[in-house]
Amino acid sequence: MALVTVQRSPTPSTTSSPCASEADSGEEECRSQPRSISESFLTVKGAALFLPRGNGSSTPRVSHRRNKHAGDLQQHLQAMFILLRPEDNIRLAVRLESTYQNRTRYMVVVSTNGRQDTEESIVLGMDFSSNDSSTCTMGLVLPLWSDTLIHLDGDGGFSVSTDNRVHIFKPVSVQAMWSALQSLHKACEVARMHNYYPGSLFLTWVSYYESHINSDQSSVNEWNAMQDVQSHRPDSPALFTDIPTERERTERLIKTKLREIMMQKDLENITSKEIRTELEMQMVCNLREFKEFIDNEMIVILGQMDSPTQIFEHVFLGSEWNASNLEDLQNRGVRYILNVTREIDNFFPGVFEYHNIRVYDEEATDLLAYWNDTYKFISKAKKHGSKCLVHCKMGVSRSASTVIAYAMKEYGWNLDRAYDYVKERRTVTKPNPSFMRQLEEYQGILLASKQRHNKLWRSHSDSDLSDHHEPICKPGLELNKKEMTTSADQIAEVKTVENLAAMPTVFMEHVVPQDANQKGLHTKERVICLEFSSQEFRAGQIEDELNLNDINGCSSGCCLSESKLPLDNCHASKALLQPGQAPDIANKFPDLAVEDLETDALKADMNVHLLPMEELTSRLKDLPMSPDLESPSPQASCQAAISDFSTDRIDFFSALEKFVELSQETRSRSFSHSRIEELGGGRSEGCRLSVIEVAASEMAADDQRSSSLSNTPHASEESSVDEDQSKAITELVSPDIIMQSHSENAISVKEIVTEIESISQGVGQVQLKGDILSNPCHTPKKSTIHELPLERVPAPESKPGHWEQDESFCSVQPELARDSGKCAPEEGCLTTHSSTADLEEEEPVEGEHDWGPGMHSGAKWCPGSVRRATLEFEERLRQEQENHGTASAGPTLSNRKNSKNDSSVADLMPKWKSDETTPEHSFFLKEAEPSKGKGKCSGSEAGSLSHCERNPTMPDCELLEHHSLPAPQDCLGSDSRSKKQEGDLKKQRAVVPNQECDTQAILLPLPKKIEIIEYTPTVTSLGHTEPGGEATPSKEGEKQGLRKVKMEQSITMFCALDENLNRTLEPSQVSLHPQVLPLPHSSSECDRPADPNPMLSSPQDKGDCPSTPFKTAAPFVSCSTQGASFSLDYLLPHSVVHLEGCTEQSSATDNELSPEQASWEDSRGHFLSSGSGMAHTSSPLTNEDLSLINKLGDSVGVLQKKLDPSPEACRIPHSSSSENIRDLSHSRGVVKEHAKEIESRVIFQAGFSKTSQMKRSASLAKLGYLDLCKDYLPDRELVSSESPHLKLLQPFLRTDSGMHALMAHEPSESAGAQQNPQPTKYSVEQLKTSECIVQSKPVERPSVQYAKEFGYSQQCLLPKARPELTSSEGGLPLLQTQGLQYTGPSPGLAVAPRQQHGRTHPLRRLKRANDKKRTTNPFYNTM
């Protein structure tokens, strides 16, 4: 179709005035300048249709050039105008068939303004002697009276009868005939309306043309007789003689076939006779009897094709004819026209706003390149409240493809949904195969751009949206859009959590409802697992989540508002979220402060990966104790989660896959991580959830936790990301992992490779143990991983999830990204070994390594170069492994590890690096079977971290971050923190406990925690617990931003399992003595129950545990006050105090670090006071506090000896003692009361005033395990003092206990804060400092503050921490069954020694432990 302009001048014979208006109802412009008059026509092959000038405001363009698409029609129109009067105008010119080969004949409809200003029309027959003739003659004049009738003759033409005259016209094409019929019907309608009849005063000007008939006789005869021109179509061949017996059935078939033919054929080049012939060919029968029916149907179809189709309220899809129908366009409110053709011109340039896409409907056409422009044009029309017509020639291929592309981008639909939607409204829609391929490519581009957009969003805002989506495209995770949708749908079907948006990205394990998990796992279907990197939910995160959901055809808006998950992916996330968890998230989310949001933005993005159901199944299977999280039994859920911890991440993909995934994740994470570090709480606080292939029931538990996490909008988006990082979903990263991620940023790929190589030696064991550990640890691990920016690793392997996250932290920086890439693969292969190496290489990875015995030490070797630190860390890990049960190794490892743990804890808090704990678990498993207890500690730590993550201001996260950096620095950013860490780390390596100023003197054997401290020197005695039962969150202020988001992460870990995925405490052990529950490994942690600090210390424990040898079988002691379901525990900041690293070894490690620890902790305590900026922030531990801590450490040592067969386990740092344990026990009672008081206060207060300190202390890390919400922990003090025993229980209760512990911790902290003198105040750093932190024993107020801070963070994330605790109770029984049988007896003393070797040991020991862990992975035992 083309637009041609014809110049015309009045003929000399004309006597009409120059101003006489042309016949066209005033549509023609006045001929004030006759010589410059031009007319515009819409031309197709064989026809020209006059185009009115609209409002006449624009002068028609004057072009003397011939339109290449008009053929000779433009020339013929020019010749025809010579025969017309100046006042007359051509309405239509249609080329007709002729009996003479070289003769060209046109039926011309001419109109003019009549006597009463009405339009009068006649039909003229014009003859051209030859096709190229420039002159024409007139052979027919036929006035159109009111009695005019038009009939189709069935042979490609129509007859016009009027005043007893009948003339037959046979246009050269169907399109030309359609144009003629339209014009004739309009003219006849006007004639009937005004009753034009022969002899009246109308059409008197016909005589002028009748007197000018000048064609030769043969032409005149053709016009008059017409019989010989009819060119009847010959009869059909004898072949087609069978007439269908059922006429009705035949007509239906004719309708269908006819529409197909007319849609496929170029109607400009085919006649109705040819269409009927084609129809007969396809139907294999003679349709002569149906020719009338066929003609009528043809007209109906043409009419349908001629009217534009309304696809959306503001979008019409049509053909060139629709674009040429001015009246119809104006009636429909169209002001914008998108012309997707090269051959069709813009018909009304002065009336409509046009945008042209000059392309042909060909296979080679690249239409995709224009879709961004077309989207903007259509959006512009929508923005201005107008409507847009998108047209090509037929409205079938080019324009339809463009509208489909618009729908995909505007509404986030997938190709199938958009295509079906458009096809349903315009049945003729049929993009050519090339356009369909381009639409598929565009779908991928939109998906990738969403991910990039989200990443950018997260990197520039509080949200972790960016990484969430990017993982979807991770090579490691080969999930296409449909697969992702399917996974999400499966999860949604299995279990839908309605309040996904409400739930902050607290550590919520991926808990696909058990049914769903079992279904998906057993059916080997793909299940979505969420991997959350952020502690807080942000609009951006939600948006990202929604976007991912949109990928599945749901509008992002639908999920955004309520995370109801209208989208497929959203539903998946929802399914992952536990209904019980959802409310908690919702409650916490409202409490998120701007600070929290900022922190979240700084944190590593939340990652959600879809893990193939097969992988999930196997990993879940690996989780021995992971019951259906969906099941009502809280203990069952908790146990399942614990089991997940124990076996979490053992099942890795190939090292190569892991490496690839890590590399990708590292890149994405490096940006978010560095940004997070810069912002302060620079730790990548992304806790990444990895999907581990576990038994279906275990998977369900994990999914529940995951669901808890995904209950928040953040979870939702993570759910999508998790699809990419499906493997990492089940993994829980411990706070240490978060720290590791930060240091990891500085790690180089080379370092990672080196670590991988070192780890590869124990790969076999690690993988086996890793699977086992990763499954038990799975849930907590997930959270941690979730936080980690690194997502590709988690996707490939759930266990490596934390590990990967550590690497992803590395990837935060480009170089780190590469390094992490290396680490991730090796992590994927060897969770335990890799974790250790990563800790060494990448301090940020430390959290992940925390799971490993010495993994934490190397987490943050930022002091020097990442590589240097990594090497040193590996060395120390190896030493730690060697000195598995030696306390002397503890201090060195603790220092190194502490720094790393600190950073890991910080990372975990900010990044939900529960995964970190998982690597630790893996590591511990490697080190020894007894290390399973440590694994639990690690899990506990991860749980604590989860808690921190949950609460945007969770002290645990803050603590971790503070450990990584000074409180202020932590806030500043990961980079500054890393630098400080490097300096501090060097110092801390010697004195890891220093990170916990308050706990420094205590020097509890919590190497992992200590490492966290080392990681962030700024974090001072987070875990310090003083008799006052308070926690000093020196890091609270610093970590508030990051930690708030990261708190969520620590929730994941349950005390039932070590962070090494080992059950820290056996049921009998738990029952025996809450204080002893920590086992030698959790000596400090035992103190923790007395104070929310234990929770804070849980991360510290985690850090310590990794440092401590695996041999310590100290049960994983989390202070989980209430038995909530596993998933809830993850959802809520666990009150479980994971005395990770509180093993003999931990104690020994602490002892090593004791001198440094004291000084370091003192300094840290100051940091806590200043950094946390909390009311209850305590100055560095006083001598009294240190002594208290030491006593606790001794007590823990005794407990460890009793609980842990290994000498190292029995070994307790000088800071931990039975006396301390007893003190913790006693303070537990006091704290318990306080906890009750504070618990109520905490419930009503969303945020902790002392979040920073809590976060900064190891207690904060432990608090991460507490199910503390910002809402629940109005005061760190509340958390600390209220539930010391709850804290103890929490380690055992992954979900339930975690929740209760959180509640208990919140009140405990408040009470602790009030009771500044209470011993509950051992800080998490203290815990870290001493591997054996007695969680139940209050040491000092700082710890409470830390706990409060942790609780605050959690509250920020989980406004209803207490409700979450309650929800967690369902899962608690499971956890209790595993390791919390003792929870009831001494709720405050539940200690989850994470047995993270060398947590307090130097990096060297950590490295050694890491290596050991890799090799010792098989030793992981779930007690």
From Swiss-Prot:
Interacts with filamentous actin. Tyrosine phosphatase activity has not been demonstrated for this protein to date. Residues 307-448 form the Tyrosine-protein phosphatase domain. Transmembrane segments: none annotated. Residues 248-303 form the DEK-C domain. The gene is Ssh2. Residues 910-932, 976-987, 1033-1042 have a biased composition (Basic and acidic residues). It comes from the Eukaryota. Residues 9-18 have a biased composition (Low complexity). The modification Phosphothreonine is found at residue 1422. Keywords: Actin-binding, Cell junction, Cytoplasm, Cytoplasmic vesicle, Cytoskeleton, Differentiation, Hydrolase, Phosphoprotein, Protein phosphatase, Spermatogenesis. The keyword Phosphoprotein applies. It catalyses: O-phospho-L-tyrosyl-[protein] + H2O = L-tyrosyl-[protein] + phosphate; O-phospho-L-seryl-[protein] + H2O = L-seryl-[protein] + phosphate; O-phospho-L-threonyl-[protein] + H2O = L-threonyl-[protein] + phosphate. Residues 884-904 have a biased composition (Polar residues). InterPro entries: DEK_C, Dual-sp_phosphatase_cat-dom, Phosphatase_SSH-like, Prot-tyrosine_phosphatase-like, SSH-N, Tyr_Pase_AS, Tyr_Pase_dom, TYR_PHOSPHATASE_DUAL_dom. The active site is at 392 (phosphocysteine intermediate). This is Protein phosphatase Slingshot homolog 2. GO terms for biological process: cell differentiation; negative regulation of actin filament polymerization; spermatogenesis. GO terms for cellular component: acrosomal vesicle; cytoskeleton; focal adhesion. Residues 1-37, 51-70, 698-725, 833-858, 878-950, 967-991, 1021-1042, 1074-1105, 1207-1226 are annotated as: Disordered. Its EC number is 3.1.3.16, 3.1.3.48. It is an enzyme of class 3 (hydrolase).
